From Swiss-Prot:
It is an enzyme of class 3 (hydrolase). It comes from the Bacteria. Disulfide bonds: none annotated. Gene3D superfamilies: Hotdog Thioesterase. Keywords: Hydrolase. GO terms for biological process: acyl-CoA metabolic process; fatty acid catabolic process. This is Uncharacterized acyl-CoA thioester hydrolase BU274. One of its GO terms (cellular component) is cytosol. InterPro entries: Cytosol_ACT, HOTDOG_ACOT, HotDog_dom_sf, Thioestr_dom. The lineage of its organism: Bacteria, Pseudomonadati, Pseudomonadota, Gammaproteobacteria, Enterobacterales. The keyword Hydrolase applies. Its EC number is 3.1.2.-. GO terms for molecular function: long-chain fatty acyl-CoA hydrolase activity. Belongs to the acyl coenzyme A hydrolase family.
Length: 135
């Protein structure tokens, strides 16, 4: 499938607006902010799957594909790739809808990554996953 025909994978787990306080020296949205939104979105899905607390333990193969501008709508999609004894592997994508910058209305994938979360107990130790209660 060509990039032009690519569709988001998974469900939308987070939607926000890129703001001026998140720009880098080039005037684009800082990649670290994008990564933090991806971690939040992935953690939401991981918490729903685990039925409790999770901790991010690793990020694999993060790719920043296109820049993001101030005022763009940032959509975070996530889907579960694998469930282990205590770990959850989540594919996360950031899709951008252009509102204030050209071309208006364009929708594209700006970043993608694999996040690994571990279900944890009240003391922060890994715990066995509970059966999925939703999704």
């Amino acid at each position: 499938m060509s990039e032009k025909n690519k569709l988001p994978k998974g469900i939308i787990v987070l939607k926000t607006l890129s703001m001026p306080e998140n720009i880098n020296a080039n005037g684009d949205i800082f990649g670290g902010w994008i990564m933090s939104q991806m971690d939040l979105g992935g953690a939401i899905l991981a918490k729903e799957i685990s039925g409790g607390k999770v901790a991010t333990v690793r990020v694999d193969s993060i790719n920043f594909l296109k820049s993001v501008s101030v005022g763009d709508i940032v959509n975070c999609y996530a889907n579960c790739i694998k469930i282990g004894k205590s770990s959850i592997k989540i594919n996360v994508e950031i899709w951008i809808k252009k509102i204030y910058s050209k071309p208006l209305g364009q929708y594209y994938c700006a970043a993608e990554a694999i996040f690994i979360y571990v279900a944890i107990n009240k003391t922060g130790q890994p715990r066995e996953l509970l059966p999925m209660s939703i999704i």
